[in-house]
């Protein structure tokens, strides 16, 4: 008998979701890489695994694997899918869940319209918490690239590391070429997700994201949170920001720098299947 899976997406950021509560699942890095292949596998940006938790106050463990097979600590779009998955398949009857990832705890609320709000915690700017190799915390950092040029960027952690660059037009931003250079830069010892942010007005930004281990995706929840936090902190944007990504819009609310930042958006089921090998 193979492993049952469900294909889901959040604004086109696509996943396979695996029920590790009712199935015994142990996937290797190589197996995840094969499944992620869009020609010879299923194809996805991340593989999400929900497991039982033995810790009081935590409903489930939420594990996230990038397409390269590496486990990471945060995925906001995936969290929305996990919440709907858990309720749809009867793993819980609750509308408010707490899940534990590799690096953090997340509170998830299923709203009446089936959108999901995700408490992404308080963003962190200290270099050691991102992690970023830097002598001191700064609003902006300069990175020297392989070609000798330098690029200025902001750096932040929202449960996973993000670099955010301000650009005039995201349509012409070199997301893949520059994003890859920054993602693998030695100053980011765990690699980094790279957001290219265009400010539209006081309440809206446009965003494209190069995700570590995936490349550019058409939506990135944690990337939207990171960019909105940077926009609020350093560019005086509103405490409620609409982030427009190629896959659609997310709403980010952050009342003050010491409060948790909240991500709200949709999640969708696509199909069910069985992994045969």
From Swiss-Prot:
Pathway as given in its UniProt record: Amino-acid biosynthesis; L-lysine biosynthesis via DAP pathway; DL-2,6-diaminopimelate from LL-2,6-diaminopimelate: step 1/1
Biological process annotations from GO: lysine biosynthetic process via diaminopimelate
Catalytic reactions of this protein: (2S,6S)-2,6-diaminopimelate = meso-2,6-diaminopimelate
Residues that bind substrate: 13, 46, 66, 76-77, 160, 193, 211-212, 221-222
Keywords: Amino-acid biosynthesis, Cytoplasm, Isomerase, Lysine biosynthesis
Record carries keyword Cytoplasm: yes
Listed InterPro entries: DAP_epimerase_DapF
EC class name: isomerase
Major localization listed first in the record, in broad terms: cytoplasm
Active site (UniProt): 75 (proton donor), 220 (proton acceptor)
Superkingdom of source: Bacteria
Described purpose of this protein according to its UniProt entry: Catalyzes the stereoinversion of LL-2,6-diaminopimelate (L,L-DAP) to meso-diaminopimelate (meso-DAP), a precursor of L-lysine and an essential component of the bacterial peptidoglycan.
Family assignment from sequence similarity: Belongs to the diaminopimelate epimerase family.
Name of the protein: Diaminopimelate epimerase
């Amino acid at each position: 008998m193979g492993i049952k899976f469900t294909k889901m997406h959040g604004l086109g950021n696509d996943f396979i979701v695996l029920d590790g509560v009712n199935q015994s699942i142990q996937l290797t890095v190589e197996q995840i890489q094969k499944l992620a292949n869009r020609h010879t596998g299923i194809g996805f940006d991340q593989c999400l695994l929900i497991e039982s938790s033995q810790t009081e106050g935590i409903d489930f463990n939420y594990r996230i694997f990038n397409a390269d097979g590496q486990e990471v600590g945060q995925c906001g779009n995936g969290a929305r899918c996990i919440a709907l998955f858990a309720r749809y398949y009867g793993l819980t009857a609750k509308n408010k869940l707490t899940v534990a990832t590799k690096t953090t705890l997340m509170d998830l609320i299923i709203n009446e319209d089936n959108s999901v709000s995700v408490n992404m915690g308080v963003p962190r700017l200290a270099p050691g918490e991102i992690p970023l190799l830097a002598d001191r915390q700064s609003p902006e950092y300069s990175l020297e690239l392989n070609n000798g040029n330098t690029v200025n960027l902001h750096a932040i952690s929202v449960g996973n590391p993000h670099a955010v660059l301000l650009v005039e037009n995201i349509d012409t931003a070199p997301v893949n070429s520059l994003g890859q250079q920054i993602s693998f830069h030695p100053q980011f010892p765990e690699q980094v997700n790279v957001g290219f942010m265009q400010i539209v007005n006081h309440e809206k930004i446009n965003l494209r994201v190069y995700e570590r281990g995936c490349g550019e995706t058409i939506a990135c929840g944690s990337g939207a949170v990171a960019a909105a936090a940077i926009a609020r902190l350093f560019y005086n944007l509103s405490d409620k920001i609409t982030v427009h990504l190629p896959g659609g819009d997310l709403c980010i609310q952050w009342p003050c720098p010491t409060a948790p930042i909240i991500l709200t958006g949709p999640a969708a089921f696509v199909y069910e299947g069985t992994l045969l090998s």
